[in-house]
Amino acid sequence: YDLGMMKYSTMIWTSDNTHPGPRIKIQYGSMLAYPAATMSCHVSRPATLADLDYRFHVALGGALGYELHLPNASEAVKARIREQVREYRKYEDLILRGDYYPLMNPFTDVGSAYYFTDPERSRFLLTFLQTGGNAFHTFKLCIAEADPQMVYYDAIGGETYSGAQLRAGIPVTGSADTQYSRMWYFVKV
């Protein structure tokens, strides 16, 4: 992954490693220097539908792709992939052209958390990816760019929050499952 490659392609693989644990760290480090639009982030080799969802949430750190042999996939997996692609399209411009704010460092924390926002600060895609211990520990994920005077609707969870609440932090409780993820899509009302 180097700048010289950007002369020939605007998007490249950050790594051949698509396993979620290492991939979260790879994407975190890459995002400190490169925009998300340069990263090709793929879902591959899911063992279960829950694993497919977790890998999808990890791959939302950049340009989404799939590395699967679809003729061998079950109808449930194919249906879930169609849903995931539709969901990705809702956030694609925010991920590829928005501003990125890391909240948790996967090298020192039990996972990764970050958000993307648009220049107007009217939309926020917040992602939490747990990779290890501290099951049931509650974290506060603060969206410092939210306008404290505005109200935001979470289009995924269906709840409404004030900008002041987003700035103070959204509580998220970890899980005993080391591959636990959670997303929020806040839209200014």
Which sequence ranges carry the predicted segments?
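Carbohydrate-binding surface patches
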Residues: 106-147
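C-terminal beta-strand-rich structural cap/linker in extracellular carbohydrate-active enzymes
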Residues: 163-189
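Active-site proximal loops enriched in glycine and acidic residues that flank catalytic Cys/His/Asp
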Residues: 70-72, 127-130, 156, 188
